From Swiss-Prot:
Signal peptide: none annotated. It comes from the Bacteria. Its EC number is 2.1.1.72. It holds the Pfam family N6_N4_Mtase. GO terms for biological process: DNA restriction-modification system; methylation. Transmembrane segments: none annotated. Residues 135-138 are annotated as: Binding of S-adenosyl methionine. DNA restriction requires both the Res and Mod subunits. It comes from Salmonella typhimurium (strain LT2 / SGSC1412 / ATCC 700720). The keyword DNA-binding applies. InterPro entries: DNA_methylase_N4/N6, DNA_methylase_N6_adenine_CS, N4/N6-MTase_EcoPI_Mod-like, SAM-dependent_MTases_sf, T3RM_EcoP15I_C. The gene is mod. This is Type III restriction-modification enzyme StyLTI Mod subunit.
Amino acid sequence: MLKDNQKHNESVAPNSAFLSELQRALPEFFTADRYNEQGELIAKGGFDLARFERALKARNIDELTSGYQIDFIGKDYAKKQAGEKSVTVIVPDVEHNTLAENKNSHNLFLTGDNLDVLRHLQNNYADTVDMIYIDPPYNTGSDGFVYPDHFEYSDRALQDMFGLNDTELARLKSIQGKSTHSAWLSFMYPRLFLARKLLKDTGFIFISIDDNEYANLKLMMDEIFGEGGFVTNVMWKRKKEISNDSDNVSIQGEYILVYAKTGQGALRLEPLSKEYIQKSYKEPTEQFPEGKWRPVPLTVSKGLSGGGYTYKITTPNGTVHERLWAYPEASYQKLVADNLVYFGKDNGGIPQRVMYAHHSKGQPTTNYWDNVASNKEGKKEILDLFGDNVFDTPKPTALLKKIIKLAIDKDGVVLDFFAGSGTTAHAVMALNEEDGGQRTFILCTIDQALSNNTIAKKAGYNTIDEISRERITRVAAKIRANNPATNSDLGFKHYRFATPTQQTLDDLDSFDIATGHFINTSGQLAAFTESGFTDMINPFSARGLGVPGGASGEETLLTTWLVADGYKMDIDVQTVDFSGYCARYVDNTRLYLIDERWGTEQTRDLLNHIGTHQLPVQTIVIYGYSFDLESIRELEIGLKQLDQKVNLVKRY
């Protein structure tokens, strides 16, 4: 599969990801692929622009002849990245995931480059995430951000891909290792493009940012999410005190940009604030003792659509009012019976409905948050958990709680692919404990090494992701200590996204699918000369990839394949024995054969299981490196003789 992904990436153009999105939304305007008699692809289908223009004209839809878009050095390369597939593998942290508190958890912590992680998640989490929150690098010049891509293609390949001359190539490569605006935009573009595809149609994304890149981010988000996707720009007061951090203005706030994937979602109402209740509601009275209340007009204007109801109302003091009322007469009488009508101080005024504060559905949020929490609270939370300031700029959980409650219900999925100190996970777990919710989180951060002079390094942490995971563990322990009977999901599954060694990639490249042999550069049969392993499974073990966690090569390959095939990380995997060979079975339909030692006896046993309906199977996926050609042919012939269709997929 890695070879397939590498080959796919070579053909990806800057517009490939866009065309894929367009085809999903408007398949009727794409021509079909064309194949020859041997079933080989000879011409790939494409977008039929003429047909699309005819459809627009037929529906009297005017084209926009002008518009504005953001442009920057590296944009075409960033677009190409958005369409590429990952060439990393997913390594389960078996030692962690099998612990009692984690084995049944639906929370995920993903360690790796978030671009690779987002590419993988396209397969199994597209259109399923309820909200995304990210706190990316602000590109302040002192936050450590530099463009990380090393341009895996040669100069000639880059020139051919994007039609660059020597000067343009030099400009593109100038962003490498830099912190320019173009470098930051090139870094963020593919990540935000892929993130949008993960959201449900009702989903929202919240992005923390400051003045350094706000203007550029707004334009880029307008391009990726559409101008109509813009919801608001929140100003969050992150610092309460005035400081001398500038000669001109003391910076106290930063922004939270909010976008919706489509117009189908709506932010939740917030509970009425104490200040609003104090200002707008009356104190309880003998007549209305249930709590603070306010009178609301029962009349409607004649101009309102939907009309109203005309009838006479006689007040307690005998005054008669005839108006256009908002409620039918029977509904009004019900309000009177429930003591929810106010007739004024003299009991003769125009009747008004009594609304109690505790009956209110809430109020919309504002775009200025000056009383949520500050960065000081975020730092104090870290200090309380760790006993030291192991993270410099953590967001406070109160801020994330507010965002989460605005965006999703109690059972939503929250994604944060710049996880940092793990505040998002902390907020999710705390909210679930407070209101009995079943929200789940997906966190991702890179295993960036910590500098030797940092407090975290001196405290024993080696990488940023270790701090994030330790915070989740400590928060969970604190919740359990406060409530031993809690039913909240306080664990998480951990996976690392790793790149195979160059030696392993060289071995993969040397395999000749047609003959089933490894061929050296001289065209001669070769053993595994590069990776040092005697098979093509163990190089993908945790040991072979140089990461902890104890995963076998089979577990890594299976996890990677399951994600590629659209299965969630928590899919139940069963083991089926075929004459001593352990196969993996999922979804009551799909069988994975990864290990070596498959032969005639196993094929016979498998065909018997399927043919006698002991095991329903629709698809069998085999690891081509573990099978000789004769075993594959024998399996293909046997499957064709069954009275049901079973697909055989060979992966390399």
